[in-house]
Amino acid sequence: MSVYQKLLQIRNEKGAGFFVLLDPDKMDVPEIVKLAKKAERGGADGLLVGSSFLLSSRFDEAVKEIKANVSVPVVIFPGNANQVSRHADAILFLSLLSGRNPHFLVGEQVKAAPMIKEFGLEPIPTGYLLIESGAPTSVQFMSQTQPIPKDKPDIAKAHALAAEYLGMKFVFLEAGSGAENPVPDNIIRETSDLISIPIIVGGGIRSPEIAYNKVKNGASFVVIGNAFEEDDSIMQEFAEAIHVNKNVFPSPIEGGDKKR
């Protein structure tokens, strides 16, 4: 079974999947391994490893050590073509469709593709859409692109539909690491109602209640990063909120309970 198929199986069984984002720039290798093990024990379904900057030279070492210490899928979430490691299970093969910078639409992908082939990594084509979150984010600055306005769901929907028609397997709605505000529920809901491929949502999700609402509005996978760098004791609460088929989380919301 491919990693992609395994992730879909997790989504179908649990209602949604729970990813923890690990940034090698923000902690050393022993610390990142410790957090990875806590994430697995806390109910994470997979680990994303990546950084907007990658100031550290220990990316490959970090991926290798994480993989050696956990059994859940380890998936690279690359900021550029340098973030490729033979030790991962798969890589989100991102194309930044919300921007018009050819470097991140296809340039980095061309550089990374031969390495992905050589390493035998499973590429998961993913349409990456930045959504306005209230303040400039690292990925916005590094990619030199503007996010989709948070009050323009039709623009987000058109980009997501284009991603599906281009053959992407996921759409990633991204508010940005440490975002002031997460992706709005109505954008998730309306996009989910329009497209047939799974939606990943990340950025600015600081509480289990927020995570739950993202799932109930159509997110198939939720990514949490900064919240655990500050307090890793709440991982299980996030897992219970995201795994809506296994737990009843008391947070009523409006709309968006898409069939899966």
Residue ranges and their predicted role:
Residues Q83-A160, E164:
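Conserved anion-binding
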Residues F18-L22, L47-V49, V74-I76, I91-F93, ...:
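Hydrophobic faces of well-ordered beta-strands that scaffold small-molecule active sites
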Residues N80-F93, I205-V222:
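Catalytic cores of alpha/beta
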Residues A16-I32, T137-I155, V201:
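Active-site mouth loops of central-metabolism enzymes
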Residues M142-I188, E229, I234-M235:
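Glycine/Thr-rich beta-alpha phosphate-binding loop at enzyme active sites
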Residues M1-L22, M115-G120, I124, E132:
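N-terminal amphipathic alpha-helix/helix-capping segment at the start of soluble metabolic enzymes
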Residues F59-N80, N181-R206, F238-K246:
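Alpha-helix-loop-beta-strand connector modules within alpha/beta enzyme cores
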Residues V49-L54, S95-F104, A175, G204-I205, ...:
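Glycine-rich phosphate-binding active-site loops on the catalytic face of alpha/beta enzymes
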